[in-house]
Amino acid sequence: GPAMRAAHEAVLAAENPVRRGLQPAPAHFLGRQADVAEVLKALSTHRLVTLTGPGGVGKTTLAQVVAARSRRPAVYVVGLAEIAPGADVVRAVLDALGRPAPGDGDPYRSLSGALAQPGTVLVLDNCEHLVDPVAGLIGRLLTTCPDLRILATSRRALDLAAEHVHRLEPLDAASADRLFRARALAARPGQVIDDRELKDLLRRLDGIPLAIEL
């Protein structure tokens, strides 16, 4: 019956995991292990988890690491940064999944079909400029695909009833110091870093990883 078929499909998926849109692991990923563990745990108990925080705080990197460490059979990562406000979000996500929208059919049906297999995780990265259409799409997907889990990243929450918000804070002083030294020494091995100057610089950078790496 359908239940037996679904169980069989789940076993097959576990043996042949699907991974799309994942980036190589970052060379220097410091001070975020607790966040990774908390987000993975949240995804096991909530169907929608949104990573929020200011630009450059590391939401995309954290989402990529969480996606890579997920044990669910199908994980799709879709970056929305280049999608213009007003664009068709359904078609944009379909394209990112490698499943072009049908010429005459319903693109949403194609998308929900692609995401309906048991144990699927969809990561929607950089949602802040598309909050309304993305929230609308997520609401539909959570209804249509009962086993789908969604991880979104956005500078602000999506304000959906199912949403669990994980706010990503700037790095603590020790992690910021380690990140700067690791990146600086990778760029110029052997250079001497003045501790006092570094402390002053890091205080101005407010623990924002993107600023530290630049």
Language model: regions and residue ranges:
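Conserved strand-to-helix beginnings and helix N-cap segments that scaffold or border functional pockets
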Residues: 1, 87-90, 134-135
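Intrinsically disordered, charged and Pro/Gly-enriched terminal/linker segments
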Residues: 1-24
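N-terminal pre-P-loop "Q-motif" helix
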Residues: 25-39
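Short, conserved phosphate/pyrophosphate- and ester-handling motifs at nucleotide-, phospho-/glycolipid
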Residues: 32, 59-60, 205-208
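Post-nucleotide-binding-loop coupling segment downstream of the phosphate-binding loop, primarily
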Residues: 37-42, 47-57, 61-118
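A conserved switch/coupling segment of P-loop NTPase cores
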Residues: 67-73, 109-175, 181-182
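Helix-loop-helix "sensor" segment of P-loop NTPases
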Residues: 97-107, 147, 156-206, 211-212
